C-alpha cells in the first residue's frame, strides 16, 4: 500500500471490478466457481491481482460485481478483503446480481452490471471510476493511468497492450493517432487489424477503463435506454465514445509494476486450461516474469492458517524432495519427488510418486506410486494409487480433459467415473 498518501487521483477514485463471468474456456475448472475465483500462484485467486493493484495504487473504495457461481468468490472476498474501515473513508462492497432493474433480468452485460448499481456508486460520490476485469493476472499502478486521463482531458481512458495478431480475436482491437487518441475500436473482430508498421501485432483493450463518474453514469443511462444495445462496454459504450467523444489509450508499459528495469511487462488472460497451466508453471522458473516476491507491491489474499510444508523420508527411491517447484503451507511430500510443479495449500503427495510440470489445487491427495506429467488437478481431488497421466495421450483423453497442447485436467467427477 505504498501509494496510499501520494496518489492524488487514486484517493478520489472507486475501483469497480467486474467478476461475474464463468470463463467457459477453463472447462471443468469453472463448473462450480467463477473465473475470478479460480486459484492462482500457490495461494491466491485470480481476482486478487486486480484488487491488489487497486489497493497498492492508493484506491480505498472498491466494489465487486458478481453473478455466475458466486459462492466461493464471495466467501473468499469476505474472508480475505474485510479489512476496509468506513471511519477512514474506505469501503469494500460485494454486489451480486439482484434483479434491481427487472425481476426477469440479471446483469445483461458488463455495462448493465454497473448501471444496476448506480445508486451505490452515487452514495460514495467518487470523482473517478476505475473499471476493472476481475479475471486477469498482472501488476499495474492505476494512479498513472488516472494521471494520463486527467492530463489529456479524456472522456474514457482505455488500458491497452500489444498482442500477436492471431490472438487478438478475443479482445477489443483499437487504432490510435500520434497523441494516443483512439480513432477506431472493434470488439473481438474475426480479422483483427494490425498495428501500423507491425503486421503481426494488434493493439488490444485490457478491459480496464477510467472515467469521471458523472460522465460514466450519464453514458450508462443513455445506453440503458437504447433498446438496440447489448449493454456491454466493449461492444457498445466504448465504440460510442470513440465516435462521439474523446477516448484515449493508456499503454500498459507506462504503468506496469516491474521488479527491475529489465523485467518485461507481464499480463495474462489465463482464459484456457493451457494458458492457466503455463502461467502457473512459469512461476517455477529461476526468475519468473511475474514477481510474487515484490514486498512493495504485494498480492493480497486470504491467508489460511496452516503449518509449514513438510518433506519426509530419505531413502533411495523414496525421498521427499522438490526441484524448481513452489510448495505451499500445509503440504506433505512423503517420499515423493516434484519437478517444476506448483502445489497449493494442504496438498498431500504419497510415497514413490513422481510429479512433473503439474499444478495441484488445494487439498488434493496424490496416492502412492503415481506418475503425473503436464497435469492440472482440481481442488480436493483424491488420486488413486498407481495412476499414470501424461504418458499415453489416447488413454488420457478417454479418462480426462486433455487439451490440444497435451495438458490434462483432472476433477473429482472424472476420478469418480474411473471407480464406477
Swiss-Prot record:
InterPro entries: ADP-Glc_PPase, ADP_Glu_pyroP_CS, GlgC_bac, GlmU/GlgC-like_hexapep, NTP_transferase_dom, Nucleotide-diphossugar_trans, Trimer_LpxA-like_sf. PROSITE patterns: ADP_GLC_PYROPHOSPH_1, ADP_GLC_PYROPHOSPH_2, ADP_GLC_PYROPHOSPH_3. It catalyses: alpha-D-glucose 1-phosphate + ATP + H(+) = ADP-alpha-D-glucose + diphosphate. Gene3D superfamilies: Hexapeptide repeat proteins, Spore Coat Polysaccharide Biosynthesis Protein SpsA, Chain A. It holds the Pfam family NTP_transferase. It is an enzyme of class 2 (transferase). Keywords: ATP-binding, Carbohydrate metabolism, Glycogen biosynthesis, Glycogen metabolism, Nucleotide-binding, Nucleotidyltransferase, Transferase. GO terms for biological process: glycogen biosynthetic process. Transmembrane segments: none annotated. Pathway: Glycan biosynthesis; glycogen biosynthesis. It comes from the Bacteria. Its EC number is 2.7.7.27. One of its GO terms (molecular function) is glucose-1-phosphate adenylyltransferase activity. Alpha-D-glucose 1-phosphate binds at residues 107, 172, 187-188, 205. Belongs to the bacterial/plant glucose-1-phosphate adenylyltransferase family. Homotetramer. Involved in the biosynthesis of ADP-glucose, a building block required for the elongation reactions to produce glycogen. Catalyzes the reaction between ATP and alpha-D-glucose 1-phosphate (G1P) to produce pyrophosphate and ADP-Glc. This is Glucose-1-phosphate adenylyltransferase. It comes from Rhodopseudomonas palustris (strain ATCC BAA-98 / CGA009). The gene is glgC.
